[in-house]
Amino acid sequence: MPKRILIGTVTSDKTDKTVTVLVERKVKHPLYGKIIRRSKKYHAHDEKNEYTLGDVVRIEETKPISKTKTWAVKDRVVAGGTQAIEADLDVAEATPGGAE
């Protein structure tokens, strides 16, 4: 059976060699037909601690690494949100009176 691959956002990188990845999916409600979002968090192995908060990453199912870790980060899809925060700070400093 092929390995499952999911794409999600890193929500925590505080633990050593582990990141928490939030994976969202959209499902149709069985009775009402409305499209609703469902999410699940996975602990994924990050050997070199190279992925940070806000990164969109691809994770791949592996053999169990620990009690809760059965996924490993394969690669980065989109860089994280720290660059956007720094850009907002630059704009706030450039405008007189802050970011109004």
Curated annotation (Swiss-Prot):
GO terms for molecular function: rRNA binding; structural constituent of ribosome. One of its GO terms (biological process) is translation. Keywords: Ribonucleoprotein, Ribosomal protein, RNA-binding, rRNA-binding. One of its GO terms (cellular component) is cytosolic small ribosomal subunit. InterPro entries: NA-bd_OB-fold, Ribosomal_uS17, Ribosomal_uS17_bact/chlr, Ribosomal_uS17_CS. Disulfide bonds: none annotated. Pfam families: Ribosomal_S17 (PF00366). One of the primary rRNA binding proteins, it binds specifically to the 5'-end of 16S ribosomal RNA. PANTHER family: 40S RIBOSOMAL PROTEIN S11 FAMILY MEMBER, SMALL RIBOSOMAL SUBUNIT PROTEIN US17M. Belongs to the universal ribosomal protein uS17 family. Part of the 30S ribosomal subunit. This is Small ribosomal subunit protein uS17. It comes from Erythrobacter litoralis (strain HTCC2594). The gene is rpsQ.
